[in-house]
């Protein structure tokens, strides 16, 4: 069942210097994005967020994705306390959760910044829910897996954002947009990033406006290949 006529998407940056992040945030805000996910590193994330906020304004949401590079609970909490005054919408995988979830639960108890494990395995999502170790999930995979994982999160009262495609091209972007449209609790801007390509091969048919992409209504995926 389709739940959304348009789906939220966020701006995105790879690891950069703080000034480069700020320039991208300014560009993202000009293009109408409300949220910016960035590949964060512990040595410059505080300066990065400060400069991004100055460049894009205090309402510009930032999702911090360290890819585990914050290292441990202590460092993650230290950085969270320095960042809590900004519009930080989530920490995505700040440090390793294996072999158990107790330190993720401890993080949640000590800071208001939402914590997001990036998981595709349904059993791992269930274990994180049971351990009270997550506020939301970053998930994806096949359509079946995505719907199962999102359904478990919804039953637990949690939103998700989807990484079904990532840095693909326009056809896969259209596919990801349709998947997003049928996930009721996919309320966090997704990582469908075909529009960042110089040429997405569909002639810019799914360009975001004000941080949303319209779900195509035409038959099939609803887009056509630009053969030129």
Model-predicted regions and their roles:
Residues 81, 87, 98-114, 119-219, ...:
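Shared catalytic-loop signature of beta/alpha-barrel
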Residues 15-18, 41-45, 66-74, 90-99, ...:
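Short, small-residue-enriched loops and turns at beta-alpha junctions
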Residues 1-77, 81-85, 202-228:
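N-terminal capping/lid subdomain adjacent to the active-site entrance of alpha/beta enzymes
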Residues 7-14, 34-38, 60-66, 91-92, ...:
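Hydrophobic faces of well-ordered beta-strands that scaffold small-molecule active sites
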């Amino acid at each position: 069942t389709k739940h959304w006529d348009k789906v939220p998407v966020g701006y995105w940056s790879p690891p950069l210097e703080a000034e480069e992040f700020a320039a991208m945030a300014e560009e993202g805000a000009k293009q109408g994005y409300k949220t910016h996910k960035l590949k964060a590193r512990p040595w410059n994330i505080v300066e990065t967020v400060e400069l991004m906020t100055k460049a894009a304004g205090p309402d510009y949401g930032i999702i911090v994705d360290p890819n585990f590079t914050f290292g441990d609970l202590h460092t993650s909490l230290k950085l969270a306390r320095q960042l809590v005054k900004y519009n930080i919408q989530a920490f995505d995988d700040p440090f390793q959760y294996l072999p158990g979830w107790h330190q993720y639960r401890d993080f949640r108890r000590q800071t208001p910044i939402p914590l997001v494990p990036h998981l595709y395995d349904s059993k791992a999502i269930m274990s994180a829910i049971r351990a009270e170790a997550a506020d939301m999930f970053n998930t994806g995979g096949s359509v079946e897996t995505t719907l199962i994982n999102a359904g478990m999160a919804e039953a637990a009262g949690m939103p998700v954002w989807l990484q079904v495609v990532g840095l693909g091209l326009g056809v896969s972007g259209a596919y990801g947009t349709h998947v997003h449209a049928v996930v009721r609790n996919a309320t966090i801007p997704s990582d469908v990033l075909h529009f960042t390509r110089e040429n997405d091969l569909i002639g810019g048919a799914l360009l975001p406006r004000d941080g949303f992409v319209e779900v195509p209504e035409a038959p099939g995926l609803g887009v056509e290949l630009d053969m030129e």
